[in-house]
């Protein structure tokens, strides 16, 4: 029951983001739509409970693509972190075959796919998963013929089943992505990363490290905090700062942030804001980088409060420390365990992209 309640709470911002492209005041819109949103959330959860059973609710997240089809009787799940694709159905094998094909050939335009609706995902002439998955012959799956052939192979040779708590039987197939699937996705966005790096003076490896940590280069990424896209920009907080920097009012919409070019530009411009406004005064470049990474996750105020409640004095303390000391404090003393781990993960990822140059 606790798990179910947590997932329903997680669904609230997800459903709001997927059911609205409004770019007005988030807080007002959210408050006004509370009753309708509660109804929508409850209906979705109830549908999944009735069809799949208790504790089978699965929704999209930062590093997981989840799409229901066939009136929620079929679903596709891509774990971009683990490199695993699972497609399962409570319907017949024909529906599973169709879901396999549509998943393998889906495009990269997150704006064009409603993750909350239960319709089929459009087949794209430029599938997003090309280069990340191969068929049983080792071929790239880039057209309908190869996808159909591979789907037939999977159903004939790798079909599995499991029993749900409600007594229903699920048929499913699992597909392992290639070993370097993360790097394949990263390369898709290199040109956009380089443009943003030059525009804002932020190191490419830092941008890539943050993208990997935030979304594992999942263009459909959305979180319980309503963060969206590759760099997980929250519209009503960082989004407002970003628009203010650009001389625009309001906040970015869902469709704006699900555009990879806009999302990367937004995320990198926020790094610029952290560096040149909120954390301005930190003199050591390495200490600044550590502070920026931690602040991207937890906010600049939270980072500075680790050192002192007075922001100016906190910056002076940081400047008297060696970068290694700043790193150690942010990864051990920061009150948020998520923020502590975040700096560790981004720093490790950034180092790997530096070596890859």
Curated annotation (Swiss-Prot):
Membrane topology term reads: Lipid-anchor
Q: Where is the lipid attached (N-palmitoyl cysteine)?
A: 18
**Localization annotation:** Cell outer membrane
UniProt-listed Gene3D superfamilies: 1.10.530.10
Q: Which residues cross the membrane?
A: none
Q: State the UniProt keywords alphabetically.
A: Cell outer membrane, Cell wall biogenesis/degradation, Lipoprotein, Lyase, Membrane, Palmitate, Signal
Q: Where is the signal peptide?
A: 1-17
Matching entries from PANTHER family are given as:
MEMBRANE-BOUND LYTIC MUREIN TRANSGLYCOSYLASE C (PTHR37423:SF2), SOLUBLE LYTIC MUREIN TRANSGLYCOSYLASE-RELATED (PTHR37423)
- The molecule here is called Membrane-bound lytic murein transglycosylase C
Which organism does this sequence originate in? Mannheimia succiniciproducens (strain KCTC 0769BP / MBEL55E)
Q: Which gene encodes it?
A: mltC
């Amino acid at each position: 029951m606790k798990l179910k309640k947590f997932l329903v709470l997680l669904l609230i911002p997800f459903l709001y983001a997927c059911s609205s492209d409004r770019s007005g005041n988030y807080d007002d819109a959210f408050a006004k739509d509370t009753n309708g949103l509660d109804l929508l959330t409850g209906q979705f959860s109830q549908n999944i409970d009735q069809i799949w059973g208790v504790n089978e609710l699965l929704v999209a997240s930062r590093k997981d693509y989840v799409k229901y089809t066939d009136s929620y009787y079929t679903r596709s799940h891509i774990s971009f972190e683990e490199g695993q694709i699972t497609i399962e159905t409570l319907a017949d094998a024909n529906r599973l075959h169709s879901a396999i094909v549509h998943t393998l050939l889906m495009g990269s335009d997150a704006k064009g796919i409603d993750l909350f609706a239960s319709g089929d995902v459009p087949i794209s002439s430029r599938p997003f998963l090309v280069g990340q998955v191969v068929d049983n012959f080792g071929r790239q799956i880039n057209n309908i013929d190869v996808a159909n052939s591979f789907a037939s192979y999977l159903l004939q040779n790798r079909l599995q089943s499991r029993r749900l708590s409600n007594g229903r039987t699920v048929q499913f197939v699992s597909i392992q992505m290639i070993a370097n699937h993360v790097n394949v996705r990263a390369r898709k966005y290199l040109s956009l990363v380089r443009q943003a790096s030059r525009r804002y003076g932020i190191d490419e490896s830092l941008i890539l490290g943050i993208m990997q940590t935030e979304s594992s280069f999942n263009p459909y990424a959305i979180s319980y905090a309503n963060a969206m896209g590759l760099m997980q920009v929250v519209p009503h907080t960082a989004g407002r700062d970003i628009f203010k920097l650009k001389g625009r009012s309001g906040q970015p919409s869902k469709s704006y942030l699900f555009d990879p070019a806009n999302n990367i530009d937004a995320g990198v411009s926020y790094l610029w804001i952290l560096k040149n406004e909120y954390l301005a005064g930190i003199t050591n470049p390495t200490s600044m980088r550590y502070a920026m990474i931690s602040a991207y996750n937890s906010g600049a105020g939270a980072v500075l409060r680790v050192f002192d409640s007075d922001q100016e004095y906190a910056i002076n303390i940081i400047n008297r420390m060696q970068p290694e000391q700043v790193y150690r404090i942010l990864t051990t003393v920061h009150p948020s365990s998520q923020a502590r781990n975040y700096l560790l993960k981004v720093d490790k990822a950034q180092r790997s992209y530096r070596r890859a140059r």
